[in-house]
A protein has these predicted regions:
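Short, charged beta-turn/beta-strand-edge "cap" motif at the junction between a beta-strand
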Residues: 77-84, 94
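Short peripheral tails and domain-boundary helices/loops at the edges of structured domains
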Residues: 91-113
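Conserved hydrophobic positions within beta-strands
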Residues: 34-35, 88
C-alpha cells in the first residue's frame, strides 16, 4: 500500500499527529477522480484526473460501509475492456482530501480542495 504521512500540530498541546493516507497505485492503473453526479443503481459519473468523464460503479463492500456523495475525492480503477467505465476503490473524507491538497499531491485538474 502506497501511503503518505501527514503531520498536523496541535497548537494548545504541542503534540503532533500523523495520518496515513492511501494514494492511487499507478502500476494498477488507479487514478484520482471527483464524484460529479449520482446516476442511481450504485453508479455515478466521475471526472478523472486525465480529463475524461467515466461511469463509476460503487462496489457492495463500500456501499454498505460509507456513502459516496457528489463532490467527494475518490480513487478509481478504469475497466480493462471498457475504458469509459470504472470501479471506485477508495473514498477520501473531506479532511483527508484537504490534507492531500495542502501537500500538493492532487493533480491540477481536480484540485478543488
Amino acid at each position: 500500500m502506497i501511503s503518505v504521512y501527514e503531520r498536523e500540530s496541535d497548537q494548545a498541546a504541542g503534540e503532533e499527529e500523523y495520518f496515513r493516507l492511501p494514494l492511487p497505485k499507478r502500476n494498477q492503473h488507479e487514478m484520482f477522480a471527483i464524484a460529479d453526479r449520482l446516476s442511481g443503481g450504485s453508479r455515478m459519473t466521475v471526472i478523472c484526473e486525465d480529463g475524461k468523464s467515466r461511469m463509476a460503479r460503487i462496489p457492495g463492500k463500500m456501499k454498505r460501509k460509507q456513502r459516496v456523495r457528489a463532490g467527494d475525492l475518490l480513487i478509481i480503477k478504469p475497466w480493462d475492456i471498457q475504458n469509459e467505465k470504472s470501479d471506485i476503490v477508495f473514498r477520501y473524507k473531506r479532511t483527508q482530501a484537504s490534507a492531500l491538497s495542502r501537500r500538493k499531491l492532487l493533480p491540477e485538474a481536480i484540485d478543488v480542495f
